[in-house]
Every structure is written in structure tokens, then in C-alpha cells.
């Protein structure tokens, strides 16, 4: 099986402190979340964590968009 980076590692490539993009803001905030599951790849596990712990995420649709971008990147 090919190596697949974690969602967190991918998300960190989307950080941009000067951006108003919701995914960039999600990444900026996730960087400071000390309990974020940094090795996780699974959508359901990440979704469960974020629903319960990520008050910095304005909407789960932001996560959905970021995860779709992650999946597309991991296909190559």
C-alpha cells in the first residue's frame, strides 16, 4: 500500500494567515489545536473529533471541502 499523508499534514499546507478563505482559516486554527488527531486519515474519525472539539470550525462544510481537496491530492 502506498504511503498516504495524514489529513493534518495536508491541512497544514493550506495555512495562510492573510487569507480569508475558510479552509485556510481552518488550517490556521487547527495548527493551534493541541489535541487534533495529527496521524488520522479517516473521514469519520476526523469528523467525529471536529464535531465534538473544534469550536473554531464555523461549519462542518468547511471540513468537507478541505477533506475533498485532501482526497483529490492523495489520488496522485
UniProtKB/Swiss-Prot annotation:
<dbReference type="Pfam" id="PF06855">
    <property type="entry name" value="YozE_SAM_like"/>
</dbReference>
<dbReference type="InterPro" id="IPR023089">
    <property type="entry name" value="YozE_SAM-like"/>
</dbReference>
<protein>
    <recommendedName>
        <fullName>UPF0346 protein LBA0976</fullName>
    </recommendedName>
</protein>
<comment type="similarity">
    <text>Belongs to the UPF0346 family.</text>
</comment>
<dbReference type="InterPro" id="IPR036806">
    <property type="entry name" value="YozE_SAM-like_sf"/>
</dbReference>
<dbReference type="InterPro" id="IPR010673">
    <property type="entry name" value="UPF0346"/>
</dbReference>
Amino acid at each position: 500500500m502506498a504511503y498516504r499523508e495524514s489529513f493534518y499534514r495536508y491541512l497544514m499546507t493550506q495555512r495562510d494567515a492573510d487569507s480569508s478563505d475558510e479552509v485556510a482559516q481552518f488550517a490556521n486554527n487547527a495548527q493551534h489545536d493541541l489535541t487534533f488527531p495529527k496521524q488520522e486519515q479517516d473521514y469519520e474519525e476526523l469528523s467525529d473529533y471536529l464535531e465534538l472539539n473544534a469550536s473554531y470550525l464555523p461549519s462542518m462544510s468547511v471540513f468537507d471541502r478541505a477533506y475533498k481537496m485532501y482526497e483529490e491530492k492523495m489520488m496522485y
